[in-house]
From Swiss-Prot:
Keywords: Coiled coil, Disulfide bond, Phosphoprotein, Virion. GO terms for biological process: fusion of virus membrane with host plasma membrane. It comes from the Viruses. Structural protein involved in the envelopment of mature virion (MV) to form the wrapped virion (WV). The wrapping consists of the addition of Golgi membranes to the mature virion. Participates in mature virion (MV) movement within the infected cell. May play an indirect role in MV-cell fusion. The lineage of its organism: Viruses, Varidnaviria, Bamfordvirae, Nucleocytoviricota, Pokkesviricetes. It is found in: Virion. This is Protein OPG154. GO terms for cellular component: viral envelope. Belongs to the orthopoxvirus OPG154 protein family. Gene3D superfamilies: 1.20.5.110. InterPro entries: Chordopox_Fusion/A27. It comes from Variola virus (isolate Human/India/Ind3/1967). Coiled coil: none annotated. Homohexamers, covalently linked. Interacts with OPG144 and OPG153.
Length: 110
């Protein structure tokens, strides 16, 4: 069963290599040097752009996380109020049923 991802009880095992590779592809050295030379001129500028893009993405994720947190808290408060309301309705229905039983004579007054 080694090298498989989540095989079912009666399914055939699926090799893990079909989903991902654990080895990085090697790039030819000649092309690598040409790419490094081309990137070397604007290396600092591209690095700054990458950092600003990364900062924007992180800021976006944190703001979305804060919004999700606020929504979850609000939903928790609403759920608490609904549960409390349901319990109040249940108690009111029980007391009403007792009152009706007493008034119709099915149950003696307590």
């Amino acid at each position: 069963m080694d090298g498989t991802l989540f095989p079912g009880d009666d399914d055939l095992a699926i090799p893990a290599t079909e989903f991902f590779s654990t080895k990085a592809a090697k790039k030819p050295e000649a092309k690598r040097e040409a790419i490094v030379k081309a990137d070397g001129d604007n290396n600092e500028e591209t690095l700054k752009q990458r950092l600003t893009n990364l900062e924007k993405k992180i800021t976006n994720v944190t703001t979305k996380f804060e919004q999700i947190e606020k929504c979850c808290k609000r939903n928790d408060d609403v759920l608490f109020r609904l549960e409390n309301h349901a319990e109040t309705l249940r108690a009111a229905m029980i007391s009403l049923a007792k009152k009706i039983d007493v008034q119709t004579g099915r149950r003696p007054y307590e």
